[in-house]
Amino acid sequence: MAFEFRLPDIGEGIHEGEIVKWFVKAGDTIEEDDVLAEVQNDKSVVEIPSPVSGTVEEVMVEEGTVAVVGDVIVKIDAPDAEDMQFKGHDDDSSSKEEPAKEEAPAEQAPVATQTEEVDENRTVKAMPSVRKYAREKGVNIKAVSGSGKNGRITKEDVDAYLNGGAPTASNESAASATNEEVAETPAAPAAVSLEGDFPETTEKIPAMRRAIAKAMVNSKHTAPHVTLMDEIDVQALWDHRKKFKEIAAEQGTKLTFLPYVVKALVSALKKYPALNTSFNEEAGEIVHKHYWNIGIAADTDRGLLVPVVKHADRKSIFQISDEINELAVKARDGKLTADEMKGATCTISNIGSAGGQWFTPVINHPEVAILGIGRIAQKPIVKDGEIVAAPVLALSLSFDHRQIDGATGQNAMNHIKRLLNNPELLLMEG
């Protein structure tokens, strides 16, 4: 009888996912831990590895189809495979496993006494058999470092954790990185015969585009948007960045204007805390957030992603610059984790990098505000009674009018302008 592999719970509270790509087909011979498919949820693309070795008999769910946790997605001829219980799917096998707990109590190992704090939000890559093994040993699998392919946790890693040691990183990481690059290379489009005066072609909506569309529609339908547009002379900011650009480069930091904007926004969120909340109309609650995490909208080949700079209020301009650059590289390479894209309290969208100026950015719901920054352009301004040319930055602030009144929004915008106009004040207040 073929082993029926069901879509496992891939975490983040997501109960379904779209099969983006299959890496196997009927007749393929696979080994345990080989990647079967890529699954897209609302937050990221996740690789689904095989828990068994064997031969693929049948792929049950086509690419582009949404599967629910517990659905059979592929059948594998794996004679030696035991029935496995997957998180998110209950069947009679669970009752069969209960007596096994009493068979060999002597094998129960004491819970490891490591004192490090465990990140309960960490995304874990591990086979169901390894998860079960960790539970039997009394180990919190989120505390274990993975040495397998793509950081996957193995039984040896669990044993090493129990012994108080750290696993050695696998040499497969370099090879896996190469494989990922190959896997992410888009396939050449199929030849299409275009006829008539108005030729058209169709394609399935990609998983990432579908997730983006869902988020945009939800935000616009839920939050009444108001957008304020303004501009500010940033000559002093321009000079400040120029002064410290070489110093930053000496320590490997690429200094841009964006970290300054992050610090200015954080200062505004602290001064006007209504912008750092969520409005839960169904529960009749306003959630006040006493942390300042800034999302940075990033344009990638896959679509719009929003990595998050956590605790931006605690970081320097240089630190924020480094983190933004690192997250941008991960976004372009498709290697952002779900944890790196959650937890934002307010977001920045930089249309200026594409040459844009003012626009109406869509709030990243359930946040209540988003700051849009446009290009810096030389414009005539009046300074000390004279018309002079100066670099001017375009700003657009969208906010949820259910929570934020117009005057509050404009006051926040004025505060941001004041800080960007005078970077020394920004450093004092930020």
UniProtKB/Swiss-Prot annotation:
Q: Which residues form the active site?
A: 401
Would you name any one GO CC term? Answer: cytoplasm
Basic and acidic residues bias (residue ranges) = 84-104
Q: What is its EC number?
A: 2.3.1.12
Q: Which residue intervals are annotated with compositional bias (Low complexity) in the record?
A: 168-192
Xref: InterPro entries: 2-oxoA_DH_lipoyl-BS, 2-oxoacid_DH_actylTfrase, 2-oxoacid_DH_E2_comp, Biotin_lipoyl, CAT-like_dom_sf, E3-bd_dom_sf, PSBD, Single_hybrid_motif
User: Per the record, which residues fall in region Disordered?
Assistant: 80-122, 165-199
Q: Which cofactors does this protein require?
A: (R)-lipoate
Q: Which family does it belong to?
A: Belongs to the 2-oxoacid dehydrogenase family.
Protein role: The pyruvate dehydrogenase complex catalyzes the overall conversion of pyruvate to acetyl-CoA and CO(2). It contains multiple copies of three enzymatic components: pyruvate dehydrogenase (E1), dihydrolipoamide acetyltransferase (E2) and lipoamide dehydrogenase (E3).
The entry's protein name is: Dihydrolipoyllysine-residue acetyltransferase component of pyruvate dehydrogenase complex
**Gene encoding this chain?**
pdhC
